[in-house]
Regions:
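Alpha/beta catalytic cores of group-transfer enzymes, especially the acyltransferase/condensing modules
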Residues: 11-13, 38-40, 100-251
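Short, flexible helix/strand-to-coil boundary loops that buttress conserved ligand/catalytic motifs
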Residues: 48, 144, 179, 284, ...
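Cys-dependent protein tyrosine phosphatase-like superfamily
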Residues: 2-5, 221-229, 235, 241-252, ...
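Glycine-rich phosphate/pyrophosphate-binding beta-alpha loops
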Residues: 61-63, 198, 253
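FabD-like malonyl-/acyl-CoA
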Residues: 2-140, 270-299
Length: 308
């Protein structure tokens, strides 16, 4: 028997109108988004469904993404479809925690609201992220280390997304130097990302420390569905470890490709991307084309999947 994975995307896939069909037609999905509003004091439906300038600002993006992911997840499990294992990219790890049973939706919403604020506050001026396409990971790591040492500044790998796509992060000048070196070393392209800061770098450690304080009062429950953390690309065995990984995750590399490869090695053969956009499905095509990938963003996707 194969295994079904529920996987949850990170920020960057948000769009106005995300989740609206579920909110309008499914009472339980609506209740989840309304719970997010209650837990945060924000009008989540207005942020998600109405034209506004806030949805792309980190402190709002994160909670809105998680609310929609959790609402779609609720709609799926209401149909009796459950995961055998779960994972999420960066912010999406909180969706995975909900699906694993380790964190309640209410707690996840409250924590992620704070996470978004802390990450927004911690964003220093002069940070940047760049996607490096078509270069060996070890070469990129070596270039980042050499650049960091020579310039006495921060630059490192933020995301191992899929073969041929790695994101580097850090101080803008150092990221630019490293990107130029990657191009010289044979990278097909280096694409600066439109982000508000150097996420998943040492420059975000302050946000991680604040997050650790916020997590102190949160109860972590038994892990009922196995889940893999970005930090190690391995299963989290003990509830006691969850908070440490969530704290580290803010300033650590996201090992997404390694996570997916581990899941496939362990027998996973159906991957269900739950939430806005199709970024994870795109990565899957480059990691392994032989496994089944399902994208559930719109109501049409949902109905096709549950009625298959």
């Amino acid at each position: 028997m194969g295994k079904r994975v529920f996987m949850f995307p990170g920020q960057g896939s948000q769009y106005i109108g995300m989740g609206k069909e579920f909110y309008d037609t499914m009472p339980n999905a609506k209740a989840v988004i309304d719970l997010a509003s209650e837990q945060t004091g924000l009008d989540i439906p207005a942020l998600c469904f109405e034209e506004n300038d806030k949805l792309n600002i980190t402190e709002y993006t994160q909670i809105c993404m998680l609310a929609v992911e959790a609402a779609i997840y609720q709609a799926i499990i209401d149909k009796g479809i459950t995961p055998d294992v779960t994972a999420g990219l960066s912010l999406g790890e909180y969706g995975a925690l909900i699906a694993s049973g380790a964190m309640t939706m209410a707690d996840a919403f409250a924590v992620v609201r704070k996470r978004g604020i802390y990450m927004q506050e911690a964003v220093p001026t002069g940070g940047a992220m760049t996607a490096v396409l078509g270069l060996d990971p070890q070469v990129i790591e070596d270039i980042c280390k050499k650049t960091a040492d020579e310039t006495n500044s921060v630059v490192s790998v933020a995301n191992y997304n899929c073969p041929g796509q790695i994101v580097i992060t850090g101080e803008k000048a150092a990221v630019d130097v490293a990107a130029a070196a990657c191009s010289e070393a044979g990278a097909k392209r280096c694409v600066p990302l439109k982000v508000s800061g150097p996420f998943h770098s040492a420059m975000l450690k302050g946000a991680g420390e604040k997050l650790a304080d916020a997590l102190e009062s949160v109860e972590i429950h038994d892990i009922k569905v196995p889940y893999i953390t970005n930090v190690t690309a391995d299963y989290v065995k003990s509830p006691a470890d969850v908070k440490d990984y969530l704290t580290q995750q803010v300033s650590s590399s996201v090992r997404w490709q390694q996570t997916i490869e581990r899941l496939i090695a362990d027998g996973a053969d159906e991957f269900v991307e739950i939430g806005p956009g199709r970024s994870l499905s795109g990565f899957m095509r480059k990691i392994n084309r032989d496994v089944k990938v399902v994208k559930i963003d719109k109501l049409e996707d949902f109905e096709k999947y549950v009625n298959r």
